[in-house]
Amino acid sequence: SLLLSGALLFSCAQPRLNIDNFEWGKIPQQPDFSWAENVGSRQLPDSSTVVSANSFGAVADSTVLSTDAIQKAIDSCALSGGGTVTLQPGYYLTGALFVKSGVNLQISKGVTLIACSDIHCYPEFRSRIAGIEMVWPAAVINIIGEEKASVSGEGTLDCRGKIFWDKYWAMRKEYEAKGLRWIVDYDCKRVRGILVENSSDVTLSNFTLMRTGFWGCQILYSDHCTVD
C-alpha cells in the first residue's frame, strides 16, 4: 500500500501535458524502437540441406493423414544437421507436428496443411493454459525445447477449428447454468494452432494461420522469437 501511495503522489506531482493542439492519430514524437534490434530470433536454420516430406510418404490428399511422413522428414532433417523440409503443392492432412532444432518447416505457396479434426491426433503433455500448468493437447505445429527452428513460406496452415469451438460453446452453456463459467475454459480441451515452448531463436514468418480451434499462436517460456 505504501508503494501504491507513493506512485499516486508521484504521478499527481507531474506537470500536465499541453494538449491545446492535440489531434487524435498524431503523436508528439516518434517512439523509440531501437530496443527491437536486441530482441527476436538471432539466427535461422541452415538452408543448404533440403528434405522433401513427399519422399517420406506425405500425400497431397486431404483425406489421407500425412502426419507420420512429415514428422519423419523433420526428424531426418534434424539428424543430418538441420535444413529445410518442403512439401509439393497440395492439401495435406496432418495431426501434431514437432519441429526440431535447426529445421525450417517450409509451407510454400500452393501448400495447405489441413489440421486433423480428431483430438486424438494431438498427444497430451504438460503445458500452461491461461496461467495454470496442466495436461493439454499438442498444437498443430509444436516447437518445444528447441533452438534455431522456424516455420516459413507463403502457404497456409488451416486448423479447421470450428468443431472445437462448437464443443466449447455447448459446454459453456451447461457450465454457466451451474455457475461454473470459468471452469469450462480448462475442462474443454482444444487444439492450439502453434505452440513455441522452452525454445530459443524461433522464427515464424509469412505463412497464413487460420481457423484455429483455440489460441492461434502461444509462445511460452521462450526467448528470442520472431513472429512475422
Which role fits each region the language model picked out?
Residues 1-5:
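Sec-dependent signal peptide recognition
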Residues 7, 11-104, 108-198, 205, ...:
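Extracellular "leader-to-stem" segments immediately downstream of a signal peptide or signal-anchor
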